[in-house]
Amino acid sequence: MTRLDNSRVIRPATGPEISAKSWLTEAPMRMLMNNLHPDVAEAPHELVVYGGIGRAARDWESYDRIVETLRRLEGDETLLIQSGKPVGVFRTHADAPRVLLANSNLVPQWANWEHFHELDKKGLMMYGQMTAGSWIYIGSQGIVQGTYETFVEMGRQHYGGDLSGRWLLTAGLGGMGGAQPLAAVMAGASCLAIECQPSRIEMRLRTGYLDRQAASIDEALAMIEASHAEDKPVSVGLLGNAAEILPEIVRRGIRPDLLTDQTSAHDPVNGYLPAGWSLDQWFAKRESDPSAVAKAAKASMAVHVRAMLDLHAAGVPTTDYGNNIRQMAKDEGVENAFDFPGFVPAYVRPLFCRGIGPFRWVALSGDPEDIYRTDARVKQLLPDNTHLHNWLDMARERIQFQGLPARICWVGLGDRHRLGLAFNEMVASGELKAPIVIGRDHLDSGSVASPNRETEAMRDGSDAVSDWPLLNALLNTASGATWVSLHHGGGVGMGYSQHSGMVIVADGTPEAAKRLERVLWNDPGTGVMRHADAGYDIAIDCAREKGLDLPSI
């Protein structure tokens, strides 16, 4: 089993010529490769895409077999992927998914990091995160709008809708956390982001997600103060350990205006540098003594969260951004770790109630103009959504594409299928140079059960019920998505979440149009259903408005 190969540099093909037998198998192959593009993945030579050890394939042998199989797959066959390894090809039918993926799933009694690591070392499992193992990661853009929407809502709730002259304190500049600095600036706030790995700061600077780098707290704060004097928000990366810097900020009486965290705290071995440790020490100990790493990391997380609680008690609006750091701290004896809320119940759930979530699409042509044309079509189809228009304008101006050109755009039930059909028509007419791939994050309204994140504090107490993502995956399979995934442990770590994903190809054919209409209606419809079933009036009203058939509502 080979996981590290520094000789491998993966980039997807672009343009209209394909090496598979159809676009329905060319698309997952290109998206798998795009996940490992050096401008996209965090550690592509190790097959790691983002989120600690979130991988696209189990090992390089599995990667090669997946590509080989996709190239020969027939139009009525389905490839099965078990934790990043291709295990079977079966005859299905033309409207069935071409790929079905199950990643990181464990029977509940064994659903913990210790058992996962045992299997991982034996080559029997892979951590798929959310969009890493499901081949629809698009770089930090994939979470930018959701983060932006969260920060805007924080501004509405706490500062009258105006974040000018305000600053956000956070940590973590990995594949997900790397979106925070740009999202904050787009929302009108400055951002101080702590990151322990120089390579991550350098990547965010290179890709335009971060403006400046500072060597000390004082230098970072001076940069932010200067930006406020010029009425121009700035994002600053500070090299250091959050478990050391946050307590220092508390001791010095410094008060940010907003506070959150996106370190990879969900994975105490691979995702969080213990306080006082060097990177070299951390990397070595992860291999030689992972239990010691986990113990030290969790102790540091407790210190980190205590500092967040101190700032929260001092009146700083504070939110957990979904990395399970509160749970880790509580396990270490911080009994009031959940005194500050998660971002979904505090700021995002009303959107989920209407099936609104992280809809995304990718231009398989590799031509940015294809994305700009789809941006224009979105504005044309949704003429009254000025907030969305503003987002698209900012995205074009501020967001650099990583790998294949892509766009993230939060839309919901009733709009997703219209956009998908429009994109399909654009492919059919030749307005776009190649097909479009349409997908989403697993963080969506009906596709995840995660009691410390997306389903925290559900009205009816159904936080841990994971029937919903299973139903979502089954329905997307029956509806004809091109590939469907079912994962465990994404975002918050082993034992704390189950979630599903779907991707569908708009190749310009009438058959694709039928699949697009079904999938892109049904998928967000499950989100409205899930929240209506939990008793949310917004969701119940949306279900009635859209004519959903919900027998128990």
Swiss-Prot record:
PROSITE patterns the UniProt entry points to: UROCANASE (PS01233)
GO CC aspect terms: cytoplasm
Molecular function GO terms recorded: urocanate hydratase activity
Disulfide bond sites: none
Gene3D superfamilies xrefs: Urocanase like domains, Urocanase superfamily
Subcellular location: Cytoplasm
Pathway assigned to this chain's UniProt record: Amino-acid degradation; L-histidine degradation into L-glutamate; N-formimidoyl-L-glutamate from L-histidine: step 2/3
SUPFAM superfamilies noted in UniProt: Urocanase (SSF111326)
Predominant place of localization: cytoplasm
UniProt EC number: 4.2.1.49
Enzyme type, top EC level: lyase
Residue positions of the active site: 409
The reaction(s) this protein catalyses: 4-imidazolone-5-propanoate = trans-urocanate + H2O
Cofactor: NAD(+)
Residues the record lists as binding NAD(+): 51-52, 129, 175-177, 195, 200, 241-242, 262-266, 272-273, 321, 491
Biological role: Catalyzes the conversion of urocanate to 4-imidazolone-5-propionate.
Protein family (similarity comment): Belongs to the urocanase family.
Protein name per UniProt: Urocanate hydratase
